């Protein structure tokens, strides 16, 4: 049971962070399909920072600097999507897909450049990111994720910034008519998405293991986070619940060998497929009631009203 709780929290926080990132982007009117790639970029930036920091540095500084590095890398990478979608008015789905493909290639090149073996694997120490409560090992991303969840809710619903952001995703022409700079708000939404997605990527890669092969990217976690965002109806606390729901399915592959599930003698691939199958089934039944921002995916042209 402790193992199930451990992995559910581990994966649930990852999915929640990335889905919250997608939520900010889509509330501004930009569909961020590039979450998968942003996770990879955040992961490789965080791991690289972790390996380059001097030995003996305090664990708090290690955690702080690596998370900041990941968030900054994610924001910089998300600027590519923002520029293509907002300034060039490119198709957001195609642009995001291209960035997903590019991210893995970039991560592999970087990893091979810093790997002693010349492979795409990087070794690192993840001990600063782990702590125990009553025999339950958790990562620092669990409390950080809860804090960011609360902050996201407050920012989105209790601040002028959040009101303006949502206005740009619902009716950008009306927002512009009252003096809101739609372009700046959409850039802000995508940048927030990049930061949260990158932190989520680092949370996915660093705590569970001490070696990561960047050729596998993040194994579809970014796309699963998109399903979490849709199932959560673009609302922070709904997203948290949806993330934990999908995380239970994703956790089964990690605990199958040590629980009664081992008696079924199923391949781990079956358990790895479960969250994706569940997402398709759930979205098939709930997509009709979707409350997506009305202007998401539609390039804004100030001259057309």
Task: Cite the ranges covered by each PLM segment.
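Transmembrane alpha-helical segments in multi-pass inner-membrane proteins
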Residues: 212-276
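Helix-loop-helix "hairpin" substructures at the membrane interface of multi-pass membrane proteins
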Residues: 137-213, 236, 241
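Hydrophobic core segments of alpha-helical transmembrane domains in multi-pass membrane transport
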Residues: 18-19, 43-47, 104-108, 142-154, ...
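Alpha-helical transmembrane segments within multi-pass membrane transporters and channels
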Residues: 57-102, 147
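Transmembrane helix-bundle core of multi-pass membrane transporters
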Residues: 92, 103-158, 259-270, 297-305
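Membrane-interfacial amphipathic/re-entrant helices at transmembrane-helix boundaries
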Residues: 1-18, 31, 45, 54-65
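Cytosolic-side transmembrane-helix boundaries in multi-pass membrane proteins
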Residues: 152, 170-184, 257-305
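Short, non-helical or kinked segments that cap or interrupt transmembrane helices
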Residues: 24-45, 86-99, 164, 209-223, ...
């Amino acid at each position: 049971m402790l193992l199930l709780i451990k992995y559910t929290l581990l994966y649930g926080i990852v999915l929640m962070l990335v889905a919250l990132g997608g939520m900010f982007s889509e509330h501004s009117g930009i569909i961020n399909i590039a979450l998968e790639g942003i996770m990879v970029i955040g992961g490789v930036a965080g791991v690289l920072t972790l390996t380059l920091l001097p030995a003996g540095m305090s664990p708090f500084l290690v955690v702080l600097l690596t998370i900041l590095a990941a968030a900054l890398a994610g924001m910089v990478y998300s600027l590519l999507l923002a520029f293509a979608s907002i300034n060039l008015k490119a198709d957001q789905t195609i642009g995001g897909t291209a960035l997903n493909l590019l991210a893995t290639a970039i991560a592999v090149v970087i990893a091979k450049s810093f790997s002693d073996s010349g492979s795409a694997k990087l070794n690192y120490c993840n001990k600063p990111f782990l702590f125990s409560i009553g025999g339950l090992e958790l990562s620092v991303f669990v409390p950080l994720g809860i804090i960011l969840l609360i902050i996201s809710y407050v920012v989105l619903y209790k601040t002028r910034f959040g009101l303006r952001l949502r206005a740009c995703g619902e009716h950008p022409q009306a927002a512009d008519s009252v003096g809101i700079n739609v372009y700046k708000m959409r850039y802000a939404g995508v940048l927030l998405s990049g930061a949260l997605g990158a932190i989520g990527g680092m949370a996915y890669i660093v705590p569970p293991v001490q070696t990561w092969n960047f050729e596998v990217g993040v194994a579809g976690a970014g796309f699963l986070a998109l399903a979490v965002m849709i199932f959560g109806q673009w609302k922070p606390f709904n997203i948290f619940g949806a993330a934990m729901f999908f995380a239970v399915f994703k956790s089964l592959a990690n605990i199958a060998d040590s629980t009664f599930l081992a008696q079924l003698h199923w391949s781990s691939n079956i358990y790895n497929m479960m969250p994706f199958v569940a997402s398709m089934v759930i979205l098939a039944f709930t997509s009709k009631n979707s409350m997506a921002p009305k202007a998401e995916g539609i390039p804004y042209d100030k001259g057309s009203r």
